[in-house]
From Swiss-Prot:
Disruption phenotype: Viable. In ovaries, results in defective oogenesis leading to sterility. Results in morphological defects in both eye and wing. Simultaneous knockout of cutlet and RfC4 or RfC38 exacerbates the eye defect of the single cutlet knockout.
Family note: Belongs to the activator 1 small subunits family. CTF18 subfamily.
Organism: Drosophila melanogaster (Fruit fly)
Protein name per the record: Chromosome transmission fidelity protein 18 homolog
Quaternary structure and interacting proteins, as annotated: Component of the CTF18-RFC complex.
Biased composition (Low complexity): 894-913
Amino acid sequence: MDQYPDENEEFELQYQDELELLEDLPDEFNAYDGPSTSKQAAEKQKENRAPVAALRDSTRLGNSTLGSPQLSQITFGASQLGGEEEAEGTSSGGQVNRRLFGTPKGPPVGRGCSTPFQRMPAIQELENTQLTSRSYGLEKENAAANQLQEVGLKNVNKRRLERDLFGDIDDLFHESYEDPMVKKARTEEQRDHEAIERILELRRKMRESSKTLRKDDVSRLKALHDFKMRNLSYEIPNWPFLAIQRSDLERIYVRFHSEDYEQRQLDLISARGEVVGSLLGEAKDKIWQEAGEIVLSRATAAEDADVTLVNSNANSEPGRLWVDKYKPRKYIDLLSDEMTNRSLLYWLKMWDKVVFGKAFHSKREQEAVTGEGGTAGGAANQLNSFNKRTGKFESNGGWRQRKSRQALNTNVDALGRPMQKVALLCGPPGLGKTTLAHTIARHAGYNVREINASDDRSPEAFKLALENGTQMSSVLNEDKRPNCIVLDEIDGAPRQSIDYLVKFISDAVYTKVKAKGAKAEHNVLKRPIICICNDVYDPALRPLRQVAFVVTFPPIDAARLAERLVKIAFKEQLKTDFGSLIALAEKSGNDVRSCISSMQFFNAQKHSLTLQDVLNNNLGQKDRHQGLFAVWDAIFRIQRPRKTLHTDANKVDEPAQVTMTNTSVTTRVRNVLEVVHSSGDYERLTQGVYENYLQQKMPDPNFTGVCEALKWFCFTDTVQHQISRQQNYSVYPYLQYGFVAWHLLFATLAWPKIAFPTRGFEFQQKSTNQRNIFQALCKGVTTSALGVGQGGTLLLDTVPLLKRILSPQLRSVAVQLLSPKEQQDLRHTIEVMVDLGLTFVQVKSQEGHYVFQTEPDLDALSAFPGYTGLSLPYFSRQLIAREVDLERIRRAAPKGGAPSAPAAKKKTSGAAAQLPNHLQTLKPKPISASNMHSAPKQQLTKDFFGRITHKSTSTNSAEESKTDAIVKSPIWYRYKEGFNNAVRKDVHIHELL
């Protein structure tokens, strides 16, 4: 209960004003500050104490109050009592406890204490009158107040006030003047509130003063509504009017005003201008004149510069193409998508560490160091973060945060190069891909070296140009800038050049060794390479697409392109309008080069470019190859109707009419046929439609369209089979009508979700793999096991059951410890596997464990994904694999025995006659005596003239005959000094002879 005031504090708060009035009395009337030295002062003290005692009698105090522990702590000293109290000895010689009522220490100012009981006589008087104060409290209080008022007036009248000296001077004070006494009585909190109110009041006055310059939105809307109500009418009014007609054939009557009304409005505007001028001060006219001169000088300078530029260009370079003339020179001049520009520039800046020696910090590293929003660890993993710049908490999205799909890998290798060392720009022609590569490369500080891959298609020339552009000897040019290689039309390069580029990027190219014995070093790529192509899905670009940073070039916005064309037309003084340029951009497919060339053609003919010319002429149109996604988009989406300008070619004089585009079924069918025919790859288009048609929004809730679409898929498959297998190209034109049927079944106004078809390729790879496995299985079947079937019978009837047949239940023990039943099952499994040519091979699984699988893999032929079936443990497979190898060796060994003598003799003679080549040995040729002593033989020869002569050969001695027989032997032996490690077999001389 210490926080609540007691009776004494309530008294002080109730009569605070009167007590402060007593404090302001002169010194001769203040008898409470200390003991008096004169009797007159003592008498005055008694007289002044009486009204105070009367005031204190009016409080409602009881006996409990006087005997409370708070009052028992009050002590009185000589300094606090008057002279009579000291004489009577009513004081106990102490001081008032100032902590009890919060009285500050130090000499008393005014009243000696904040308590109402600072004099002992007052307490005694209250004790004597406590019984009567309850019944006569109101009369006592009124009497005490009257006495206090008389004393106060008597004391105040003795002082001369300002009003007595100067009269009424309240009008001299400013509105901000405040009585010092009142100002002193306020607390600090009240002063703060008053300062806030003062600031708000000044702001309100400032807003009211600025209302003459600007009204709020509600006031302006109200004023506009009142103006229309006074000056516009849908009915015939009473005031003068002018009738006009809207586009919906409704008439509106506009009011005519007199000249006096116009003059009054002008005067009102000028009066408002004077208010504005008063804010600017006396120098308003001078400031306004200087501002006008600055604006006029800038406009004149710009017009003069444009006229000078146009005239100089027209005179100096009359035959220069506008495409080269207005080619972007700086980054801000690019018309392409900003995200595309920033992505390519970010990839180029990742080469700064290798090329320029500057440290490059990726976005992830910066967020890890500084953190998003100023936090030390980054706020990517937090739900909320505090942003020091704004001083607010910001939501990071948490688990709902959309993760951006970045095709760029921001990681770097050991040398500080990006992981994707080549950028691949792809998009339709004419959008500015080459211009973008040149501009961003120069902006990043490189010297652009362009190589057109379709100029010289030989791999040697491509290799030489690529090496010269990236070698350190020719890296720096006159401007001391490193080279950036730009390979334009990379899709026109041969496959060998693309393969060499991939090896060059992967640091797999080695330099030629000049010195003998030197070690070849691989070439390290230290310069960025930018490749440009039209079709990123070209088969030749498949190896490059896997290692490159692919940047898809989106089409340029038609409105943004038209704004740039307006500037060019203004500089070249070509008369045209914004609508005509937008129509030209849309008709050309937002092709920048085509639009600028068309404008230059009309300017050369001294003819203005109008909307009629754009619609009637074949401007900006060219035979472009439609991409696969563009064709699929045309199949699954209905084009929204747009406003067009319809003209009749036969009636040129009649004005054109604005109509909506035709969205009838006939027009849609014609558009689909044109788009599909421009692509030509019907098989790939069919696969894309087949894999994406179920992902689209079905306009048919009964799914009858799905059944109809499947019939068209069967029809298309049949036609393609006739073309590919039987070479029947007479049915080729019917392939495109299936896309028309699918368009009419599944096309909607919504944007389709299309994914590139990959299931056909995956199924083809799986089919090829399974076909190879089955062929290996058929080759391994021995002749004794041909009864199990061949072809489809083996695949359907035998293979599904082999997994269960080849899975015996064996214990994990040695072969000698197996039971007879287990040994019989093991022997049967081994015989079946040897007859079918199967075995277990140890391979490494995707998890990193080694397992035994059948070779050929029967699981790929018979097991479904996710169904393991019956399987053997690792130990059993290892045991069976070992026994199968031993059985194959045992069967391959020749069978031996001890046959009988006649049979052995016959067998030996037969074996000698049919001995295999690898077992036969060379035997010496016998020289018989008959040959040595044979009779001479006649030999027929021809002489020089061609006549036939007979020559007799006589026999020589036995030694000569023996030597001649040896010389005529087909095998010679010659000793050669040295040895050869390739000969590993010991050969004796008798084996050769």
